[in-house]
C-alpha cells in the first residue's frame, strides 16, 4: 500500500491539476470531497485544501471540520483553502478592492521558512481570487507578500500548517512545483509513486482479484483501452479476450493497423467488421445527438453479440481513468454522471467490473504505457472520439463521404507527422462540411465539397487554443488534399478556441 497525500476538493477548477502536480513529484495522492476525509486511513502523510468558486463568508460556502486534521497532519491551504484556514481561526476575509487575477511577483519572502526553501524574491505566481485576507489570526505569520497582497503566504506558528493565496499548481507560477515539493518533504513523503511501482502492484492485485476468471475488454485503438489491455494481459494472459469493432468510421486503414499493433503486443483480439450495420442504421440521419446514440447503441449490440459467443466470462474490463472517477461524484457526494466506456451494456451480461487505470491521470497512463514497452505511436495518439468520423461528417453519413474524409484526414495526419508537428498538438482532424462551393480545376468549373482542418493545443481538453500551425504547412496540406482527394475543392482552417467553441464540431 502506497502512502498518500489527501487533497480536499472545495470545488476548484484546478483541483485535478494539484493532483497531477503532486503525482509528477512521484507522490501518490487522492482527491476527495471536502467533507469526506478518510479519518480511518493509516497511510495519510499530509493534506492540501483546494480553491473554491465560493467566498468563505458565503452562506452556502463549503465548510470542512478540520479539528481532527490540523495538528495531526501537515496542511497546505491553496487560495480558498488558505482563506478558510484563516477565517475559521478568527481572521478576516473580505472582498478585495480590485480582484486579483493573473501574474504577480513575490516582493517579500521569508527564506527561513521550510515551505519557501529555494524560492526567491521576484518569483512569478498566479493569482485568481476576488477576496483577500485582511486580518490574520495572532499565531499566523506572513511568510510571503506581493506589492498588492500582504498575506500572499503564511505559516501557523506551532503547527505544520501553511496557506498560500496564489496557485502553485498552475504553469504560470514558476516556482510552484518547488513549493509543492517542499511541502511533500515537510510531510516526510517517500515519493515512490512511479510507473514501474504502479505496474508491479497493479499486476499483483489483478492476479489476486481475478484468479483464473475470464475477462472481456472492448478496445477502441486509443491509449486508455490499449494500456488496460496490456496490463490485464500481463496479469492473466490467455484469460483476457479483447473485442475491436470496426464501425466503418475509423481513420483510413486504422482497423488493419491497430489489429497489427495489438498482435505485436501479444493480445488475444477478435476484430469485428460491422461497417454495413452502422451505415444502414445511420442512413439519412443528420442530427448530431441522434447519430451519437445510434453509433453508441450499435457498438453495444455488436459487443454484446460477440461476448455471448464466449464462455464463462466473469469480468468486463474498462479503461476508466482517475478524472472519470472524480467527476462521477460531486463534492457533495451525489452522483453527477456515470462513466462507462461501454455504457449501457445489458444487465443480463451480469459481469463484474475491473478497471486497472482508475487511479491514473491521462499523462500517467501514457507513462505506464511507455514503461510497459508499448510502441510510442500507440501511446502518443491524439484523443479520438468514440463515434469516430461520424461526428466529423456534418449531416448524413454515407460510405462515399467517409471515403472523402478518410483520404483528407490521412493526408493531414501524415504531413503533420512528417513536419514534426504531431506530438506538439493535443488533437487534430478534418471535418467534412455540408457545404459545396464553386471552384476551377483546369479549364472546368467545379462544385464540390469543403473540408475544415482542426488542430488544438491543450493539457486536459477542458480548455484549448487553436494551434498556430505554419502557413507553409497549411498551404501544403491544402494543396495535397485538393489535388489528391476526389470531391474536395476547398480547404479552410478553424481558428476557434475552447471556450466558446468545442474541439469537435458535433
Curated annotation (Swiss-Prot):
Catalytic activity: XMP + L-glutamine + ATP + H2O = GMP + L-glutamate + AMP + diphosphate + 2 H(+)
EC numbers on record: 6.3.5.2
Active site: 79 (nucleophile), 167, 169
SUPFAM superfamilies: Adenine nucleotide alpha hydrolases-like (SSF52402), Class I glutamine amidotransferase-like (SSF52317), GMP synthetase C-terminal dimerisation domain (SSF54810)
Residues covered by the GMPS ATP-PPase domain: 193-381
UniProt xrefs under InterPro entries: Class_I_gatase-like, GATASE, GMP_synth_C, GMP_synth_GATase, GMP_synthase, GMPS_ATP_PPase_dom, NAD/GMP_synthase, Rossmann-like_a/b/a_fold
GO molecular function, one term: GMP synthase activity
Gene Ontology terms: cellular component: cytosol
Organism: Parabacteroides distasonis (strain ATCC 8503 / DSM 20701 / CIP 104284 / JCM 5825 / NCTC 11152)
UniProt domain Glutamine amidotransferase type-1: residue ranges: 4-192
Record's subunit section: Homodimer.
Pathway(s) it belongs to: Purine metabolism; GMP biosynthesis; GMP from XMP (L-Gln route): step 1/1
Protein name (Swiss-Prot/TrEMBL): GMP synthase [glutamine-hydrolyzing]
Amino acid at each position: 500500500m502506497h502512502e498518500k497525500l489527501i487533497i480536499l476538493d472545495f470545488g476548484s477548477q484546478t483541483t485535478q491539476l494539484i493532483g497531477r502536480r503532486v503525482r509528477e513529484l512521484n507522490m501518490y495522492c487522492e482527491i476527495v470531497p471536502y467533507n469526506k476525509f478518510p479519518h480511518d486511513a493509516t497511510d495519510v502523510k499530509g493534506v492540501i485544501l483546494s480553491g473554491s468558486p465560493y467566498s468563505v463568508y458565503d452562506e452556502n460556502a463549503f465548510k470542512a471540520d478540520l479539528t481532527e486534521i490540523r495538528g495531526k497532519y501537515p496542511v497546505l491551504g491553496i487560495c480558498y483553502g488558505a482563506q478558510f484556514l484563516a477565517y475559521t481561526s478568527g481572521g478576516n476575509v473580505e472582498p478585495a478592492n480590485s480582484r486579483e487575477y493573473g501574474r504577480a511577483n513575490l516582493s517579500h519572502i521569508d527564506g527561513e521558512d521550510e515551505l519557501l526553501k529555494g524560492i526567491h524574491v521576484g518569483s512569478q505566481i498566479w493569482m485568481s481570487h476576488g477576496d483577500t485576507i485582511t486580518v490574520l489570526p495572532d499565531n499566523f505569520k506572513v511568510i510571503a507578500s506581493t506589492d498588492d497582497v500582504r498575506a500572499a503566504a503564511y505559516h501557523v506558528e506551532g503547527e505544520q500548517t501553511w496557506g498560500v493565496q496564489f496557485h502553485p499548481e498552475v504553469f504560470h507560477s514558476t516556482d510552484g512545483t518547488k513549493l509543492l515539493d517542499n511541502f511533500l518533504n515537510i510531510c516526510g513523503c517517500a515519493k515512490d509513486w512511479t510507473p514501474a511501482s504502479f505496474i508491479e502492484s497493479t499486476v499483483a492485485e489483478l492476479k489476486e482479484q481475478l484468479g483464473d476468471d475470464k475477462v472481456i475488454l472492448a478496445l477502441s485503438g486509443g491509449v486508455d483501452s490499449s494500456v488496460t489491455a496490456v496490463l490485464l494481459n500481463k496479469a492473466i494472459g490467455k484469460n483476457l479476450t479483447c473485442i475491436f469493432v470496426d464501425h466503418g468510421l475509423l481513420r483510413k486503414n486504422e482497423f488493419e493497423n491497430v489489429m497489427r499493433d495489438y498482435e505485436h503486443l501479444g493480445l488475444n483480439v477478435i476484430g469485428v467488421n460491422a461497417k454495413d450495420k452502422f451505415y444502414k442504421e445511420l442512413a439519412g440521419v443528420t442530427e448530431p445527438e441522434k447519430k451519437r446514440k445510434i453509433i453508441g447503441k450499435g457498438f453495444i449490440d455488436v459487443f454484446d453479440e460477440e461476448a455471448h459467443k464466449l464462455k464463462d466470462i466473469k469480468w468486463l474490463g474498462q479503461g476508466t481513468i482517475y478524472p472519470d472517477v472524480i467527476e462521477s461524484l460531486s463534492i457533495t457526494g451525489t452522483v453527477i454522471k456515470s462513466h462507462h466506456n461501454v455504457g449501457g451494456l445489458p444487465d443480463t451480461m451480469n459481469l463484474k467490473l475491473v478497471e486497472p487505470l482508475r487511479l491514473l491521470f491521462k499523462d500517467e497512463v501514457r507513462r505506464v504505457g511507455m514503461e510497459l514497452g508499448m510502441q510510442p505511436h500507440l501511446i502518443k495518439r491524439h484523443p479520438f472520439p468514440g463515434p469516430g468520423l461520424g461526428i466529423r461528417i456534418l449531416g448524413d453519413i454515407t460510405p462515399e463521404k467517409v471515403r472523402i474524409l478518410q483520404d483528407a484526414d490521412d493526408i493531414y495526419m501524415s504531413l503533420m507527422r512528417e513536419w514534426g508537428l504531431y506530438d506538439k498538438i493535443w488533437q487534430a482532424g478534418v471535418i467534412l462540411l455540408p457545404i459545396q462551393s464553386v471552384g476551377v480545376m483546369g479549364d472546368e468549373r467545379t462544385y464540390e465539397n469543403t473540408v475544415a482542418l482542426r488542430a488544438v493545443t491543450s493539457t486536459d481538453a477542458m480548455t484549448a487554443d487553436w494551434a498556430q500551425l505554419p502557413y507553409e504547412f497549411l498551404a501544403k496540406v491544402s494543396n495535397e488534399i485538393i489535388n489528391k482527394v476526389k470531391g474536395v475543392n476547398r480547404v479552410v482552417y478553424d481558428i476557434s478556441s475552447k471556450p466558446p467553441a468545442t474541439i469537435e464540431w458535433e
